[in-house]
Amino acid sequence: MSNLSVNAIRFLGIDAINKANSGHPGVVMGAAPMAYSLFTKELRINPAQPNWINRDRFILSAGHGSMLLYALLHLSGFEDVSMDEVKNFRQWGSKTPGHPEFGHTAGVDATTGPLGQGIATATGFAQAERFLAAKYNREGYNIFDHYTYVICGDGDLMEGVSSEAASYAGLQKLDKLVVLYDSNDINLDGETKDSFTESVRDRYNAYGWHTALVEDGTDLEAIHAAIEEAKASGKPSLIEVKTVIGYGSPNKQGTNAVHGAPLGADETAATRQALGWDYEPFEIPAEVYADFKENVADRGASAYEAWTKLVADYKEAHPELATEVEAIIEGCDPVELTPEDFPALENGFSQATRNSSQDALNVVAAKLPTFLGGSADLAHSNMTYIKTDGLQDDANRLNRNIQFGVREFAMGTVLNGMALHGGLRVYGGTFFVFSDYLKAAVRLSALQGLPVTYVFTHDSIAVGEDGPTHEPIEHLAGLRAIPNLNVFRPADARETQAAWYQAVKSEKTPTVLVLTRQNLTVEEGTDFDKVAKGAYVVYENAADFDTILIATGSEVNLAVAAAKELASQGGKVRVVSMPSTDVFDAQDAAYKEEILPNAVRRRVAVEMGATQNWYKYVGLDGAVLGIDTFGASAPAPKVLAEYGFTVENLVELVNNLK
């Protein structure tokens, strides 16, 4: 029976890829036995309740092998992956896109494809489960109690982010993380002996992982035994499973020819004969469906039913905790944050927005028990520390400060995994210039619709002495170009509070907070509520103004000072604070016209960064005071003056406009 089911997985993959004339059959054919063993013997999921929060998680880090996952989901009974959807693999509007997409297909626990990120994301799942278990489980009531499983390939393990995450997972002793390594000695360009020769198991042992070797990737009992041993090890686990890529293909197995191209009609026929598969394309024997129903769907449904009874009993035994748990199960924060939670701020108060962020962050932490995060070894520079808590580790699982170490990329992907798990609000910080190290993770936050908050400090050339390696220039423009990402660069402490509020209230959009090291003065015109619009009028000295200054962050202070100088010269000026271009762009046309009336063409945008995205607001007849070169090393006042960020220079720029 098991051999028939394994071959059903293989041929669903082969047939769908042939029909699409696109895809990666090799991993489907080689990894089918380990995937079958995992799904039918270990994985606890309920296809009728795909979002069950206590289900085991499965991450196909080798996302190019997506038909392996779709075949498993189809056979297990997930409604989203019908046979018609399998036949529509890689087609417009299908539930079976080329790489798995979270939120698009029920049963897909994470978007994967960029290699390495799946392993790192799984680390976040495991850490989320551990925190929620520590916080809410009580004796006899293991409400949060599941494993996170991964199938990865050689390419995943070559990527640096998997190494960062593996080092971190070993440090944290995340013992409910089990990685199955599809070790087939082949990559796209040829054999791994030409590009990847270290002992992976030795490396993972050094990280503090349990490791094992299954020498025959078709030995279902050996695979099952290795997984059971891993679960009892008390460590994160890597199981190397030696497989043959394209297993069963007489002329292509064991070669890179089967990695990323359909088998084609002739080789498919030969493979059918070699594996004894006497069925038409997309024909699956009834006994295969029965196998998956008994060993995946029914087993999972029984586990779900037992868990729901456990939750009901938990409500009786622990009613106060149960209220929070119920909210988490429903996908809500256990406590609602409100604007009134933030203290009022006096005009004229001066503080660096990184410090304002620390104050706001701690307001959030005091209100939300499931709010946690950390920094890439910069917590006391990014000001990301929750003051009431210590560091989280295996011995202190309830603490909410996470020390990610100098692992920016892993930090971003771990945060994604924690957000994907559900039940948590998470954040992570580093210097803004180092956002490049984790930009791929930020992109996947946005693609997956995850409300992760990124705290990026030291936001401009005002860093000064550290020089151009530490002074962001192109970073704002680059992040603003990512769809479904809200970038906030607040002007003062008041706007910083509001930006944090917007971040925590977000449901499907990640947030980037771009913050200063230098002090900024709270302006009289800044407004907590209006930050929700992305831009608003912060200063105006005449109703019939003929000049608009648009600024973000620290430059709002500069723009207001310049506007007051222009007013003293008889100028009629409006200053617009635009903490988030992304949010402003989402407003309706009437609001945009209210803030930036089309009739007023005399406009200057002011921001210490690349100028390219500002011309959409000032037009070709306006001007931008920005920076399109790298920064410099000198005391901050000198650097700012040399780059023209002075009241005198801005006033002159405005006066030179027609």
Which residue stretches match the model-derived regions?
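A short, small-residue-rich loop immediately preceding and capping a beta-strand
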Residues: 20, 56-57, 108-111, 141-159, ...
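Cofactor-binding active-site loop characterized by glycine-rich and histidine/acidic residues
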Residues: 30-171, 385-386, 414, 418, ...
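Short, surface-exposed connector motifs at secondary-structure boundaries
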Residues: 51, 147-148, 208-211, 342, ...
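A glycine-rich helix N-cap at a beta->alpha junction
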Residues: 78-88, 170-182, 205-209, 446-461, ...
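Thiamine diphosphate
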Residues: 91-103, 127, 131-134, 140-145, ...
